[in-house]
């Protein structure tokens, strides 16, 4: 049976459907998703916990976590210390898994339900920050994919691709991700298991070919001691944690198609197992490989270690990983544009966002240094993302993830979530306290805080602001929110 474009609502998209029902259900992926940042009715919630777990494994199966693991070695840690930093940094994924519960319980994406603690207008600032952060990650992911395609061009004989090659590689990498994101949630969920399996196998082959020569006693030439070692471990953990923190602002987006009665433990363990498991696996692989070679170029740096056929597969894994993650980032970024109150449908917002991402990637390729841009960007993610997430998650726990779906989409003073002049001062104040804590405790290439210097360079900006913002919001708004829940 052919699922034609007239029935799919997606011009030009035709899917082959076999006899089995499970393949027939795939044809629905051909239709462009019409939902945006609105409520998902129970009748349209098709997702299963198992699919959600594979989804998270897929979006985390990209080179970024491999690069972060290698970065821990580059900071001057020993092999064991770098592995510890990777594990500690990814421990924040427990919060990502827990916050995903909001998806099925509320049926809303993060930037809709966060109107409750920040106010309808106040939350637009968070939507703008979310979009800006997603633009940064799309740029990083896109660049990793572009480097892979350029390496493939070299293997195919195009030894000096120059500007035309860079532009072509950028269009290919971003183009595939954009098509998936514009199509929507179902297609995202369907393709991620294939990305996860292919990339996991390729990195396993890479590990098998390199593990025999890993320097298990790796120590830097000038190893720090005492508080210096602790400071470096926490700095590396902060870089690794930026990946988990970035998901805290979008985690319900992907889980909101789960039925509302999905058991909490299934949501938590599927997200944790799929997402954190893949992130730790790739991060530790990056640590091990970095003891053997310089990975400042994360694609070409692997070439001397492996046979030609495996290097080509590694290039493919980097390319696929860039697409797998960027597709999901483009998806949530489109929701963020809607949450800013720009009157566009989700797929149009995503298409607009794609043009801006294209400009950003080309700007880094031709103007700025990638490594410097990456470090500066990651150092700033932690300052805002953690406090924002802490407030909306604390608010959700206080109200038991119960929201008035009509009122939360009302954009005037009649909404129960309007606040004072459209702003919930309690939520903004709690987030500001957390951000202030982050600025006081950060130690990064871009910012060196006073308190971090007094602590020997220890970076606490990746978890302490979360604790502060959550505690302050519970103190300021706890009684009021619980009263709203009791009043119905």
Regions found by a protein language model. Name each.
Residues 16-79, 231-237, 256-264, 480-488:
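Membrane-interface "cap" regions at the ends of multi-pass membrane proteins
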Residues 47-65, 207-213, 223-289, 308-327, ...:
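Hydrophobic, membrane-embedded alpha-helices of multi-pass small-molecule transporters
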Residues 73-75, 101, 117, 125, ...:
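Membrane-water interface regions at transmembrane-helix termini and the short interhelical loops
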Residues 85-117, 128-142, 478:
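Juxtamembrane transmembrane-helix boundary signature
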Residues 123-158, 322-339:
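Hydrophobic transmembrane alpha-helices that form the core helical bundles
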Residues 127, 155-183, 197-208, 240-251, ...:
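Transmembrane alpha-helical segments of multi-pass small-molecule transport proteins
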Residues 147-150, 155, 197-222, 240-245, ...:
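Hydrophobic alpha-helical segments and their helix-loop junctions in multi-pass secondary transporters
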Residues 198, 388-472:
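C-terminal membrane-solvent junction of multi-pass transporters and transport-like membrane proteins
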């Amino acid at each position: 049976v052919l699922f034609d474009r007239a029935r799919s609502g997606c011009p030009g998209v035709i899917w082959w459907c076999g006899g089995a029902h499970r393949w027939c259900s795939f044809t629905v992926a051909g239709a462009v998703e019409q939902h945006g940042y609105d409520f998902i009715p129970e009748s349209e919630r098709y997702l299963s916990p198992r699919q959600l777990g594979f989804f998270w494994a897929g979006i985390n199966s990209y080179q970024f976590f491999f690069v972060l693991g290698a970065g821990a070695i580059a900071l001057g840690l020993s092999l064991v210390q770098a592995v510890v930093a990777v594990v500690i940094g990814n421990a924040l994924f427990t919060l990502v898994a827990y916050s995903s519960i909001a998806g099925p319980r509320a049926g809303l994406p993060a930037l809709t339900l966060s109107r409750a603690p920040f106010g309808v207008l106040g939350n637009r600032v968070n939507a703008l920050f979310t979009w800006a952060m997603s633009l940064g990650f799309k740029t990083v992911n896109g660049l990793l994919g572009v480097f892979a395609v350029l390496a493939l061009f070299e293997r195919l004989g195009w030894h000096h691709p120059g500007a035309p090659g860079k532009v072509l590689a950028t269009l290919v990498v971003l183009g595939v991700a954009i098509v998936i994101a514009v199509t929507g949630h179902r297609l995202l969920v369907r393709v991620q298991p294939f990305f996860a399996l292919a990339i996991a196998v390729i990195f396993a082959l890479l590990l098998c070919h390199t593990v025999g020569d890993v320097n298990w006693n790796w120590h830097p030439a000038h190893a720090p001691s005492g508080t210096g070692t602790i400071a470096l471990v926490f700095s590396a953990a902060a870089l690794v944690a930026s990946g988990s923190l970035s998901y805290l602002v979008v985690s319900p987006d992907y889980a909101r198609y789960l039925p509302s009665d999905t058991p909490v433990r299934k949501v938590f363990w599927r997200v944790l197992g799929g997402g954190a498991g893949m992130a730790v696996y790739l991060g530790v692989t990056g640590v091990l490989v970095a003891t053997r070679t310089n990975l400042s170029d994360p694609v070409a740096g692997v070439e001397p270690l492996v046979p030609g056929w495996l290097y080509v597969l590694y290039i493919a894994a980097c390319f696929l990983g860039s697409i797998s993650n960027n597709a999901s980032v483009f998806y949530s970024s489109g929701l963020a544009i809607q949450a800013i109150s720009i009157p566009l449908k989700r797929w149009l917002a995503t298409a607009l966002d794609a043009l801006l991402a294209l400009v950003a990637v080309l700007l880094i390729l031709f103007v700025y240094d990638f490594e410097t841009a990456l470090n500066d960007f990651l150092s700033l993610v932690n300052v805002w993302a953690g406090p924002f997430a802490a407030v909306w998650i604390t608010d959700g726990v206080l109200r038991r993830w119960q929201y008035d779906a009509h009122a939360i989409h009302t954009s005037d003073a009649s909404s129960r979530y309007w606040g004072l002049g459209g702003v919930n001062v309690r939520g903004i104040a709690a987030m500001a306290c957390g951000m202030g804590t982050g600025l006081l405790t950060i130690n990064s290439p871009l910012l060196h805080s006073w308190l971090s210097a007094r602590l020997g360079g220890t970076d606490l900006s990746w978890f302490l602001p979360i604790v502060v913002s959550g505690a302050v919001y519970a103190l300021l708004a706890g009684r009021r929110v619980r009263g709203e829940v009791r009043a119905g």
